[in-house]
Each structure stands twice: as C-alpha cells, then as structure tokens.
Amino acid sequence: EVAQVIEQIDPYEFNVTEALKGLDGGKFFISRAEEITFTTHLVTQSEQLKDFSRHKVFSSICRDLIGPDVRLYWDQAVYKKPGTKDEFPWHQDNGYTFIEPQAYLTCWIALTDTDETNGCPWVMPGLHQKGTLFHEPTDLGHEIPLDSSESICLPLKAGSIAIFSSLTPHRTGPNLSDGIRKSYILQYAPDGAKRVIS
C-alpha cells in the first residue's frame, strides 16, 4: 500500500518542485525546491489518496481519539531532499492553522524508513497541555524557542504512523542521507471545528 501511495504522490510532488525551480531562489514560503517540498490537497486530485485517507486504520484512530464525528482537515506530502542540512524547526501544527476547538489530530505517515540520519520527527511530550504556544517567524517557518533536551526521537519504518495532537511541539532533523525522506501527513478535526483567521 505504501508503494501505491508514493506512486500517486510523486507526480504531484515533481510538479511542485518544478514550479519552485521557476521562482526566485527556488522557494516559496517554507517550500524549497532542492531541500523540502510541501504538496498539499492531494485528496482533491487523487481518488486513491482520498480512499487512503478514509482507510479503516485512520477511522479507528479518529474514533478512539476524537469521537465519531470527524472530518479530514488537511493533507500534505512532505519530501525532504538528500543533503538538506537544516532541520524543520520546533512548531505546533496549530501554529500554522489555528482552529477551534484547538486540538486536531496529526497522522504522520512514513513513506520511507526514517531515523535521525534523514529527518525523522522529534516530539516534545507534555507541552500540548499548555495550548497554542508563541511561534517566532523565521526563514524556515514558524518556530517555538524550546530546549530540546527533553525531546523524544521517533524513528519510523515505511508504513508506520506517528500520531500526535496539533498542539504537540515537533520538529524534523536534517536529511544527511542520499535518498529522499518521504512522508504523508493526514490531519483530522472534529466535525464542526472552525479555522480561526488571526
């Protein structure tokens, strides 16, 4: 199933990369053609990915953690290119898209094996209880200034899922490998949740 998901995503990610290459500096907001790309709204372009987002695994997770009335809030593929030296900084997903009620659910799906060498996720446990934290704007995106000493590394095999609240601070490290680190992120919110525009 992972191979089929990659097969669906790759052409769209290629188009995003090519579009970024045509822009000044090869970047737009936090996407960088040669470093990290964000390919969004894939379920609106691929019936297979729409079906994947409705897989019984996600339905079961959402029912257990959110309740029976859930909708897909956001989806994106994040490809971290080989040799990317920068980490993607500490942030909460709510720091990018704030909704009420605050917490929604992030399913971070590894499409390739990922560990400390190629940009696996790290999380900071417990801080989700403090709500949405202050984020500073940086060249690499919104960042929460945090001491990383208590953080937990989440190495994942392809097909594995890291599940956390949109209020959980997390980051990904650099990709020092010679392969693309591929992930697909599905986020689910309670039905009726509203996006708050600040």
Pin down the residues of each PLM region.
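Short, conserved beta-strand element in jelly-roll/cupin
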Residues: 65, 91, 98-116, 155-156, ...
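A generic structural micro-feature
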Residues: 86, 99-103, 178-180
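Short, P/G- and charge-enriched loop/turn segments at secondary-structure junctions
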Residues: 93-96, 149-151
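Non-heme Fe(II)-dependent double-stranded beta-helix
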Residues: 1-90, 96
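Non-heme Fe(II)/2-oxoglutarate
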Residues: 10-17, 24-25, 134-138, 161, ...
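Double-stranded beta-helix
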Residues: 114-173, 193
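Glycine-rich phosphate/pyrophosphate-binding beta-alpha loops
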Residues: 93-95, 104, 171-175
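Short acidic/polar capping segments at secondary-structure boundaries
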Residues: 77-84, 94-95, 102-103, 111-116, ...
